[in-house]
A protein has these predicted regions:
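Bacterial N-terminal signal peptides that target proteins for export
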Residues: 2-11
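Bacterial N-terminal signal peptides
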Residues: 10-19
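Acidic, metal/ion-coordinating pockets
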Residues: 22-159
Length: 159
């Protein structure tokens, strides 16, 4: 029984020394992730009278503050950012496309690392999205479930 306790203590000491030495060998890195989503084309802060939140200018300022403080945030949008409505028609398509271009221009200036394609982004069709990706090559449009029907290849980067 006594030798069994010694054996357990030896295993515990080996376990602690291995994991302690491994933790010292790697430097920990701070990762900052800024995630937005379901923006629905809203450029300005929300309408609350007390402490209004959101808005592209505020987002731009906060993300730049992080960068100026030596942080390198990964900035992503989860999708549904382009349009203020899911009912695109001949009466509003011009204004909604203008809103979309304004959003993408702002996201480009903010320095977004990736934009997931949500259902709102699909309202004006794949060809329009491909055209937008070409106009804003520094923005990565992401989707792991939109494929070319003929080739089965991803239309946008899956990651």
């Amino acid at each position: 029984m006594k030798s069994n306790n010694i054996f357990k203590k030896e295993i515990l000491l080996i376990f602690i020394s291995v994991f302690y030495s491994c933790s010292e060998a790697f430097e920990q890195e701070d990762i900052r992730l800024v995630l937005t989503g379901s923006v629905h084309g809203q450029l300005d802060p929300c309408g609350w009278k007390k402490n209004p939140l959101g808005g592209l200018p505020r987002r731009y300022t906060k993300i730049n503050e992080m960068r100026e403080n030596g942080q390198s945030p990964i900035v992503l949008d989860a999708g549904d950012m382009f349009y203020s409505t899911n009912k695109i028609n001949t009466n509003n398509i011009k204004s909604e496309k203008h809103r979309c271009m304004t959003m993408l221009d702002a996201y480009d200036k903010i320095g977004y690392d990736g934009i997931n394609i949500g259902n709102y982004e699909l309202l004006t069709g794949i060809d329009y999205l491909i055209n937008l990706q070409n106009k804003f090559p520094s923005l990565s449009f992401l989707s792991s479930n939109i494929k070319n029907i003929n080739t089965d290849e991803f239309i946008f980067s899956p990651h």
